[in-house]
Amino acid sequence: MSPWKVIITSAFFTLFASFNQQAATAGEKGTMDFVQSILIANQMAIEQGDHKMIAIVGNGTITFSNSDGGPFTEGSSATLSVIAYIKQTENGMNLESPMSVSDASGDKLFMVMRRSTGTFDSGGGGQGRAELGGGTGKFAGLTGSCPYEVNFLDGGNVVVRATGCSWEKP
């Protein structure tokens, strides 16, 4: 074989192998669990006719466990900021709680916690659904969801546990 054919063939196979490796890592996905520990910094309620609107602001930490890789390092922790808003009527409640999680590198994960059952006072809690909605850095484009359970403790402390969170990056 001529030297040019060897060079061209080698270059082709190198590019092909490189492309295949990139394609294999482009569609990353996995599972993880997390625990959040949140301290409520402020809470306010406004009554309006047949319903009450409640806003809760808090800060805390999130720790990832049972991770099978990707951007969620097993045992790693990050800080979080959260704003919850709740509409409460005699028929129940509707809670939506967006949060921003920042890891040590400065990358941010955006999450929204939603639930329509349970309570939000000390000793209360309930179950809902956590949605992962992208972020910055290693979390950019990431989506996913999982069930969670929240417990409101004395002193404005809140504990959230989520298991079986499925996530993927396109």
Please report, for each region that a protein language model flagged, where it lies by residue:
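Bacterial N-terminal signal peptides
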Residues: I7-S18
